[in-house]
Amino acid sequence: MLELKFVRNNPDIVGRALVNRNMGTELIDSLLEYDVAWRKCLTEGDSLKHKRNVVTREIAQLKKENKDTLSKINEMQDINNRIKEIDDKIRDYKSKINEIMLSIPNIPSETTPVGKDENDNPVVRVVGEKKKFTFTPKPHWEIGEALDILDFERGAKIAGQGFTVYKGLGAKLERALINFMLDVHTRQGYLEVFPPVLINEKAMTGTGQLPKFKEDMYLCCADGYYLAPTAEVPVTNLFMDEYMENLPVSLTAYTACFRREAGKHGQDTRGIIRQHQFNKVELVKFVKPETSYEELEKLTLDAEEILKLLKLPYRLVTLCTGDLGFSAAKTYDIEVWVPTQEKYREISSCSNFENFQARRANIRFRTPEGPQFVHTLNGSGLAVGRTVVAILENYQREDGSVEIPEVLRPYMGGVEEIREE
């Protein structure tokens, strides 16, 4: 969340940021209108309360002198009624201001390129060579079904479209990737945590999922809990309403993730690229403001390391303003090569939120000058299902079998390949 004082004093900067994000400036216009009315009511309320104090003293003096107090008591009643009206307006305006403030996205960093959509995302680097097949490669869903390691029909039978059952070596591959990723990241210095995946509304608001993305979340209506859309939410909120010590703090976590938007608008309706339930390993950092962009580079390299070890070709792009997430100031997307689609697909987003999430979640640290909000960062390290997609497609052989990347074999009990039985 932005600071109200900053928005009030810099409407042009905030308005330009919204325009660069392909948004209008109506939110800012409404906010400033409510802000003026709110502050006017505060001033009027203070004046009335001062007047009430004066009348209170006058009534006391009249009583002391045994004089009639009826007119002053009536005046006091009128003042109290007016104060109640003003206080109601103050609460109403403040509620409207808070609602708008929670709906204003972060301001893109100066190094975030201005652009309309993903077509304007500049490529930072390309790593690894795309495999040249001597045969026509098959899409991962055909491979998964032929090898009997992915069962889309039974997943749909149990829960509906957008859910998949992993079987046999498919399930083992998914589990192997989770353990492999966590081992790599803990060696990189991240502390592993295993958080809840049922999240309360306050925590969801703290990281920016609410109120904007409420329709994309799964809600347990009876209890008011949301299913975690990403481990970013519970891990970041571990320090909600706290002062942090010994920054930076680096955490990694595996969780199942749940999102309602899978397959929206007809995208990726086949396979496991977009699912309502999927596994992900997350990286989260809490850092001092002056080091946050250096830490973003480190976090991104830490996520990239997984693909390097798996020997999967990928590229790194910087998201432009029109493609930037709601809470982010700057984001790198890591995109893995998917041969049958002949394009790179996002497998991780690594973002610096500056103090946007910390202000919402009230996560601070102490300095000699006074409390400051920390900067938060996170990135997928990686999306596990999409890594399975990349392995099945990039490591497939002409006979239909799939080679297991060498670094995963110890996690697979020595299995070197998956082939049809």
From Swiss-Prot:
Catalysed transformations (reactions): tRNA(Ser) + L-serine + ATP = L-seryl-tRNA(Ser) + AMP + diphosphate + H(+); tRNA(Sec) + L-serine + ATP = L-seryl-tRNA(Sec) + AMP + diphosphate + H(+)
What keywords does the record list, in alphabetical order?
Aminoacyl-tRNA synthetase, ATP-binding, Cytoplasm, Ligase, Nucleotide-binding, Protein biosynthesis
Q: What class of enzyme is it?
A: ligase
Pfam families with a match to the protein in the record: Seryl_tRNA_N, tRNA-synt_2b
Subcellular locations according to the entry = Cytoplasm
- Leader sequence range is none
Kindly indicate whether the keyword Aminoacyl-tRNA synthetase belongs to this entry. Answer: yes
**InterPro entries from the UniProt entry:** aa-tRNA-synt_IIb, aa-tRNA-synth_II, aa-tRNA-synth_II/BPL/LPL, Ser-tRNA-ligase_type_1, Ser-tRNA-synth_1_N, SerRS_1_N_sf, SerRS_core, tRNA-bd_arm
Q: State a single Gene Ontology molecular function.
A: ATP binding
Q: What is the UniProt domain comment for this protein?
A: Consists of two distinct domains, a catalytic core and a N-terminal extension that is involved in tRNA binding.
- Family the entry assigns: Belongs to the class-II aminoacyl-tRNA synthetase family. Type-1 seryl-tRNA synthetase subfamily.
| Protein name, per record | Serine--tRNA ligase
Q: Which organism is it from?
A: Methanosarcina acetivorans (strain ATCC 35395 / DSM 2834 / JCM 12185 / C2A)
Gene designation per UniProt: serS
